[in-house]
Amino acid sequence: MKLFSIPLFGRSVALATTLALAVMLVPVFDAAAGEIVDHPDNLKYKELNYKPPKPKDYRHELDCGATAYEAENPEVPTLQVTVLVRTGSMYEPLEKAGLADMTGYLMRNGGVKGMTASELDEKIAMLAGEISVNIRSDRGAVTLFCLSKDADEALALLKSVLRNPVFDQAALDRYRTDVLSELEQRNADTRNIETREWQFLMYGDHPCTIPYRRTEQSVKSITREDMIAFHKEYFFPKNFIFAVSGDFKTKDILAQLNGMLAGWPDHELALAPIPDQVPDPIPGVYMIEKEDVNQSRIRLGHIGVRRDIPDQYALLVMNDILGGGGFTSRIVRRVRSDEGLAYSAGSRFDRPVLYRGTFRAWFQTKHATGAFGTDLILIEIDRIRTEKCDEEIVENAKASFISNVVNPFSTKNTIVNTFADDDYTGRADDYWQNYAKNVKAVTPDDVLAVAQKYLHPDKLVFLIVGDPKAVQVGSDKHEERFSDFGEITIVPLRDPMTLE
């Protein structure tokens, strides 16, 4: 699927903006002049005195009932629009897996009423603009970038893409061929295998796995009529949230948006419920047969939590110390810095809004050292569950999160997109106002408590993508073997076209 890209003019502006922000957002360290600390853990942060903007200052209700977040930015002669759409591949029928993605692609690349796809491309190119459509698991996003002087014409094109796609059959046939070719190659990259098999192990037949369940049969079954029905179901004004920034006057852009949506029929959206609870998977060691590689991808974890749990801030700090904080985190130090086993390692709590996410730790290494590296991670998980962290370590982790609170508000465009996303996901209006205070309140006792509450060594699932024979042999330098961690199940690599 074609992703949003900024034209040459936009890239120049973006680069200048990025460089300026890089200077503005460098953390202010409290160290004596000329003093160089011997380790990042010893960096001291000055108090950040920053008050995030409030969503109510950017929010507007359009005539049709849709919400728009807008910010004037006369310094840059551009217009940027994002339209969030409450939809996603989680809501498509399993037997039509791939429908949401193909609908989004054809909205942009299958022509619109009165224009072929080539004619639409030409008009957008003449404006030095860009329009993209992307429908992923839990949302759709339609984006526009153009010069502000071309706003009227560009918004008219955006309206055509949103309201009047024709889903040209020839374009559908071409894209279907591309998708089938992509499926044929889905086992070539071990990253794809790892992600897919992790979803299946963790979630079984939960709707969140549908994006990974495209098959030759499901893709071939998708018709133009399916796309028309999918578009009609989800693309209507009250199901949109707008994020708009650029060189305009507020009253003018609101009038343009109202005009764009006028006369467009609405209806009530009936989203299929997404189960928020999932059963815990069976603990054990699962080895996916991929014998033509010389390294293993290793992931271990279990079912975790949703986004808005009461102790989310302590959880952020705890995982930052464990494996989410880059080179200062314990897993990265042990696996990469101390032992040199992997270039990339870490841990993360994925925290979706609609259902429980997962805790996962990961690294990639030679087959022989996989069990040794896994044991190092287990040691760190046990350590953070049983030993209270030093207050200084906790304070440094907190300071990092607090200093980054400016990032969602670094430009006018990021401000409105942050608030549109928060609106879409139901985040409280005062979330950012209270963010720093809530992070500051986290104590070493809180870190220990959430580690004990949300890390479950007895529920761990171990996923290894690599050559099972080589992985199980291990290393003569280390005694650890994957059989130490649970019962081993060898899982044949799925057929890329059928997933059987």
Task: Give the location of each predicted region.
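Bacterial N-terminal signal peptides
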Residues: A14-P27
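C-terminal regions of mature proteins
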Residues: A33-N49, I241-A243, E392-E500
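Scaffold signal of the M16-like zinc-metallopeptidase fold and its non-catalytic homologs
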Residues: G34-D41, G111, A154, R186-P237, ...
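M16/MPP (pitrilysin/insulinase) zinc-metallopeptidase core fold and M16-derived inactive scaffolds
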Residues: Q80-F145, I210-Y212, G326-L341, V353
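A structural supersecondary motif
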Residues: S89, R299-I303, G323-T365
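M16/insulysin-pitrilysin zinc metalloprotease superfamily fold
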Residues: N109-M115, F145-R176, G325-G326, D350-P408, ...
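Short acidic/His-enriched helical or mixed secondary-structure segments at domain edges of catalytic enzymes
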Residues: D178-E197, D276-S296, R333-A342, E387-N438, ...
